[in-house]
Amino acid sequence: GADASVTVGVSDSVRLTRELSVAASSPVSTDRIRDLLRSRDVRFGDYNEGELAYLTPNAAFFWNATNPQILQLRAQWRGIARTPEQFGELAREVAACNSTRTGPKAYVAPLEDGTQYGLIAECNVVVMSGLTQAQLDNFFETSMSMIMGFFADLEVTLPGFVDWDSQGREVSL
């Protein structure tokens, strides 16, 4: 840490202090995620109790900074399993994702009606000690690209689930 550094002259000391403060970890909060998304021109809205939602044509992304220990990016893919066969297809893709990819973690989740299922993918990072801006930027880029890549692959593997176009408009199958 800073204790071990050797100080040479006042200007070096001042510069070192400034560099350390720029690279310092700070707590992750919903406001900090808001600033991050705004800085990247991401159009988002408030979702329930401190979550921020971002909609893409094929998914809904949810940023959750309410847990002081973990920052989570969770996304629900727009494809829905409406039959037992489709449930099986989703479950196979989830198992393949979780056994062959470093991220995201995927799972099948029942929808409100209890008869249909959606697919959720999430990436988490431990934030107990806070994150530097570089770490936060890196988590944003890595988690978004891992989840978006997984969903793009799903749409190739399971074209029967895709009932929307590239603008997110519903299309009949």
Each predicted region: which residue ranges?
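A short acidic-to-branched-hydrophobic micro-motif
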Residues: F61-R82
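A short acidic/glycine-rich loop-to-helix N-cap element
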Residues: V127-F140
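Charge-rich, low-complexity N-terminal segments
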Residues: G1-N67
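Short, highly charged C-terminal tails/helix-capping segments
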Residues: E155-L173
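Short amphipathic alpha-helical signal-transduction/dimerization elements
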Residues: N98, M144-L158
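Short, internal acidic amphipathic alpha-helical interface segments
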Residues: W77-E122
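Glycine-rich, aromatic-bearing surface loops/beta-hairpins
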Residues: T142, M146-F150, W164-R169
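A generic structural signal for beta-strand entry/edge sites
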Residues: E49-E51, P68-Q72, G114-G118
